[in-house]
A protein has these predicted regions:
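Bacterial N-terminal signal peptides that target proteins for export
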Residues: 1-11
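Compositionally biased, intrinsically disordered low-complexity segments
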Residues: 10-11, 20-21, 58-61
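C-terminal segment of classical bacterial N-terminal signal peptides
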Residues: 17-27
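N-terminal segment immediately downstream of the Sec signal-peptide cleavage site
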Residues: 26-79, 144-179
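Predominantly extracellular/secreted and cell-surface proteins with exposed
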Residues: 58-122
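Extended amphipathic ligand-handling, pore-lining, and cofactor/metal-binding catalytic surfaces
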Residues: 110-152
Length: 179
């Protein structure tokens, strides 16, 4: 596989995984919590079921129907780190990190594309705390594909059709962090 095809394939896989990797975080002033537990669940729109069915979750990530889930591994500042990966064909994207921007109410999701580097694959709109009590904090928002034209083109190339568009809504994301 030539370098261009590999980059496009990896970017596409990352984009599909990132959605699953999107997670919640504590405010930017929070101290690192390396033993934090929790889970991020991505619920893709049912119209994307044929695409989502091509994603293979790599443990500890899990896939079920149109949902992907990733365990939270730690919270550092405004970043929520996860473990697990997804594969689409020969492309693997792993260890999603959700970076929350509390000023805008949004977040970005980056994934490490194996063989390349970490890149933003998804954005989260209206990512807010939905509940916060002594035991857990729940963040929820709307998962969108990044506006990066290279990532969008990579997704479309992976599935062989012009399905994805920049900033396209993909579904919902919910991150639960146990305190």
């Amino acid at each position: 596989m030539n370098l261009t095809k590999k980059i496009v394939s990896l970017a596409a896989a990352a984009a599909l995984v990132a959605g699953a990797g999107a997670m919640a975080a504590t405010p930017a002033t929070a101290k690192p919590k390396p033993k934090t537990k929790g889970i991020t669940v991505i619920s893709f729109d049912k119209a994307l079921a044929p695409v989502v069915s091509k994603i293979v979750a790599v443990a500890p990530a899990k896939a079920s129907g149109t949902q992907l889930s990733f365990p939270v591994s730690k919270v550092v500042g405004n970043g929520v780190e996860h473990k697990g990966a997804i594969k689409v064909g020969a492309v693997e994207a792993k260890d999603p990190i959700i970076i929350i921007n509390t000023e805008t109410g949004g977040a970005s999701v980056t994934l490490e594309i194996v063989g390349l580097s970490r890149m933003e694959v998804f954005t989260i709109k209206n990512f807010k705390i939905r509940s916060d009590d002594k035991k857990k904090q729940v963040w929820q928002g709307f998962l969108h594909l990044t506006s990066d034209p290279i990532v969008v083109a990579a997704f479309n190339q992976q599935i062989g059709a012009e399905v994805f568009k920049a900033d396209m809504g993909l579904g919902q994301i919910r991150t639960t962090i146990n305190k």
